[in-house]
């Protein structure tokens, strides 16, 4: 029997709390490489085994985003179950919909409960923010759309950072999906929440429809500042 970890360690680690972040993850990578045999019985290099373990760890604690749109509640629940979501974080500023009352705050939790999916409304991550007079317009000048610009300004606040930290904390013990009303992520403020999660080292996927899940990527314009703040400066005129 070979000394050190084997591929079965993946099954053990993906059930552990998600604590390998930043430097801690790099330390884990260093230690596991040292004690993994140079070649496994399957012919994989130690580096390949480490990459597999790290990938599975990230996947096990990934965040998802979803928009409810006009979907029937059954279809919506199926989308969450397909990726094994256990917590739905509602980031609508007003958790109600006249056109789709099945997504109202007084109805949605009951619809999710039989499937062991918890519900939480995170008001401080909600969209539809007003102009932030404390932030100069050029700081987030990339956003020509006023709603996105205002939200990018709001995301620089302590209130947003605190709410984001709470979301990440919940994501360490539950597989979390962030929900708003807009069906597609690129027309919703959850794209900015996604940027902040990715900048913090999280893994994020967008749920688009049945069998349609895509990996998220940080907006290429976003620049990370102190205290984990992102700015979106206007692109230089060509």
Each model region followed by its residue ranges:
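Residues lining hydrophobic/aromatic ligand-binding pockets adjacent to catalytic sites
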Residues: 53-238
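Basic polycationic patches enriched in arginine
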Residues: 21-23, 29-30, 34, 39, ...
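Extreme N-terminal basic, low-complexity initiation segments
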Residues: 1-12
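Residues marking helix boundaries in flexible regions
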Residues: 10-13, 33, 54
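Charged/polar low-complexity intrinsically disordered segments
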Residues: 11, 26-28, 42
């Amino acid at each position: 029997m070979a000394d050190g970890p084997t591929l079965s360690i993946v099954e053990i680690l993906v059930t552990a709390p998600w604590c390998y972040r930043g430097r801690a993850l790099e330390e884990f990578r260093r230690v596991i490489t040292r004690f993994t045999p140079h070649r496994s019985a399957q012919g994989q290099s130690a580096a390949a085994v480490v990459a597999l373990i790290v990938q599975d760890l990230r996947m096990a604690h990934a965040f998802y985003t979803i928009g409810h749109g006009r979907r029937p509640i059954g279809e919506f629940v199926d989308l969450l179950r397909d990726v094994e979501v256990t917590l739905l974080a509602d980031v609508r500023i007003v958790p109600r919909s006249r056109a789709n009352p099945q997504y109202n705050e007084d109805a949605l939790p009951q619809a999710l409960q039989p499937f062991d999916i918890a519900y939480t409304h995170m008001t401080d991550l909600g969209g539809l923010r007003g102009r932030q007079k404390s932030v100069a317009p050029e700081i987030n000048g990339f956003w020509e759309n006023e709603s996105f610009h205002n939200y990018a300004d709001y995301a620089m606040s302590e209130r947003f950072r605190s709410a984001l930290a709470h979301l990440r904390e919940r994501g360490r013990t539950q597989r979390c999906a962030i929900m708003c009303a807009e069906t597609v992520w690129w027309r919703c403020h959850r794209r900015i929440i996604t940027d902040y999660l990715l900048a913090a080292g999280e893994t994020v996927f967008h749920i688009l429809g049945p069998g349609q899940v895509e990996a998220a990527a940080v907006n290429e314009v976003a620049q990370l500042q102190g205290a984990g703040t992102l700015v979106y400066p206007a692109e230089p005129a060509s």
